[in-house]
Amino acid sequence: MALPDFSMRQLLEAGVHFGHQTHRWNPRMKPYIYGERSGIHIMDLSHTVPALHQSLVFVRDTVAKGGRVLFVGTKRQAQEPVAEAAQRCAQYYMNHRWLGGTLTNWSTVSNSIKQLRELNAMFESGGGSGLTKKELLDLQRRRDKLQKSLGGIADMGGLPAAIVVIDTNKEAIAVQEARKLGIPVVAVLDTNCNPSDADFGFPGNDDAARAISLYCNLFADAVLDGLAESTAGLGVDLGASADIASLADADVKLADEEAAGEA
């Protein structure tokens, strides 16, 4: 599987070049701005193309070495494409409110994930006999809340090797936690962003739904390319969803074994 390709035309059609209003900008993005039109900054896609390519290469290589990737996008227009992309390539995501400490306090988050798994297992097995209707309803609500917050990372099994971020301003806490832990940040950088927030950043619109979907799909394809490299010769068909799911399951099992060994 080849590294996902994209064209300047695709970027233009998705509106990647449109930035924010000129009064809403970060001066550090000046080198990546081509000009302005009707009070809107226009980004220079000649910078976007190589930077996006470099970001895709990094993600592919990270996965090929066995690393996990966490997609982060909690703004309304990013929620669905972020979840769909992560699920398609057997990776992980957070697309609702970022919980402070998700990365920097992973042990506590792991306990909440364990509780989510236990509740899922209980309801799937028809358990809960002996509980009152109110108790069952309370547990259902607890499970739903945990699923919404942590469902996308329930099988991650440990810290990611990289995070892919849509809107570094919106996801400032996630970016801060990743940088504190030395986890590389891959991110789209709109004209109101600080380019120093990303280790692998590329100039682009972080609000348009078409642009966000394009980024997410490209990174999902890069992950699949990395998985193909890491499983070369193992007889795994990445075209089969069951095989992709099995890779994720194996990743979680390995992480659990590593954690047990460290205990």
Curated annotation (Swiss-Prot):
Signal peptide range in chain numbering: none
A biological-process GO annotation: translation
Bilayer-crossing regions: none
Keywords tagged on the record: Ribonucleoprotein, Ribosomal protein
Any one of the GO CC terms: cytosolic small ribosomal subunit
Domain of life (superkingdom): Bacteria
InterPro entries the record matches: Ribosomal_uS2, Ribosomal_uS2_bac/mit/plastid, Ribosomal_uS2_CS, Ribosomal_uS2_flav_dom_sf
A Pfam family hit: Ribosomal_S2
SUPFAM superfamilies: Ribosomal protein S2
Annotated GO MF terms: structural constituent of ribosome
Family that this chain belongs to: Belongs to the universal ribosomal protein uS2 family.
Alphabetized HAMAP family for the sequence: Ribosomal_uS2_B
Protein's recorded name: Small ribosomal subunit protein uS2
